[in-house]
Structures are given as structure tokens and as C-alpha cells.
Amino acid sequence: MPRRREVPKREILPDPKFGNVEVAKFMNVLMLDGKKSVAERIVYGAFDHIEKKANKEPLEIFSTAMGNVKPMVEVKSRRVGGANYQVPVEVRPSRRSALAMRWVREAAKKRGEKSMAQRLANELLEAAEGRGGAMKKREEVHRMAEANKAFSHFRF
């Protein structure tokens, strides 16, 4: 149902340990059934693993990984004259980070390590190096957009 005015964006409070809004958003993406403390434990555990394994600042690795995974373009279906075309469109910044976070979460879930913290740590380390499941997903989306470049004149 249409609304009379635009609903204001909710302000997300920065996470308690690092004071970073991106980390807080990632915790919210990771959270299941409203269990924020569990999500916090997983993320901070992953950051501890990263610190031990890479001897680097975990926030640095996290932001590099997220920057690498963020997609620039994606495809959207557009119906023109009875045919559906996959039209490449640029991704707006808020959606870029949301997709990146979702892809990292899903890639970490599919990994084989014992705890979710370890899976997440290894996925973030790989994404920071430009490999891993989340990067594979990004490349796949970019490939789809590149393949359908011919339909880019069907802009939305």
C-alpha cells in the first residue's frame, strides 16, 4: 500500500568493541531469531582468529574483504514485448554492502570448518585476498552483467 511520505532510515548503532557501524550491520545480517549476543560472539571470535592467523588488524581485513566482495553491476529482469531480458544495472551503494555481507555469510555457512567463527574468519581472509566463495559469487554476477551488456539500452 502506498505511503504518504518516505519512511526515514533507521540509525544503526556502532558495535560496542570496535565502534564500527559496518561491523554492527554485519552482526545484524548474521543474527538469527534476534540472538544478537550469539552473532556478536561469532563475529568477535572470527576477528580473534583473524588476528592470530594473519597478525593484522581484523577491522582492516574486514573492510578490505567487504570492499572486494561488493558488486558494481548486477542484472535485473525486464519484460519487453513478450520476452524477458536480463538487463545490467549499476548497484547503489547501500545495496552493494548489503549484498556483500549476505554473500560472505552464505559462503561462510557452506565452508567445512568446525565453528562458524572459524568459517567466517577464513572466508574474510580469503575475500581480502580476492578469492573464496563470496568472491566467486561476485565474479558470477559480474560475468552475467557482462554477457548481457547488449541489453543495457533497456534501462529501468
Swiss-Prot record:
GO biological process: translation
MF annotations from Gene Ontology: rRNA binding; structural constituent of ribosome; tRNA binding
Subunit structure: Part of the 30S ribosomal subunit. Contacts proteins S9 and S11.
PROSITE patterns found in the cross-reference section: RIBOSOMAL_S7 (PS00052)
Lineage: Bacteria, Pseudomonadati, Pseudomonadota, Betaproteobacteria, Burkholderiales
CDD domains: uS7_Bacteria (cd14869)
GO terms under cellular component: small ribosomal subunit
The UniProt record lists the keyword DNA-binding: no
Family statement drawn from the similarity comment of this UniProt entry: Belongs to the universal ribosomal protein uS7 family.
Listed name of the protein: Small ribosomal subunit protein uS7
Function: One of the primary rRNA binding proteins, it binds directly to 16S rRNA where it nucleates assembly of the head domain of the 30S subunit. Is located at the subunit interface close to the decoding center, probably blocks exit of the E-site tRNA.
Gene name linked to the record: rpsG
Naturally occurring in which organism (per UniProt): Polynucleobacter asymbioticus (strain DSM 18221 / CIP 109841 / QLW-P1DMWA-1)
SUPFAM superfamilies the record matches: Ribosomal protein S7
Xref: Gene3D superfamilies: Ribosomal protein S7 domain
PANTHER family in the record: RIBOSOMAL PROTEIN S7 (PTHR11205)
InterPro entries xrefs: Ribosomal_uS7, Ribosomal_uS7_bac/org-type, Ribosomal_uS7_CS, Ribosomal_uS7_dom, Ribosomal_uS7_dom_sf
Keywords: Ribonucleoprotein, Ribosomal protein, RNA-binding, rRNA-binding, tRNA-binding
RNA-binding keyword on record: yes
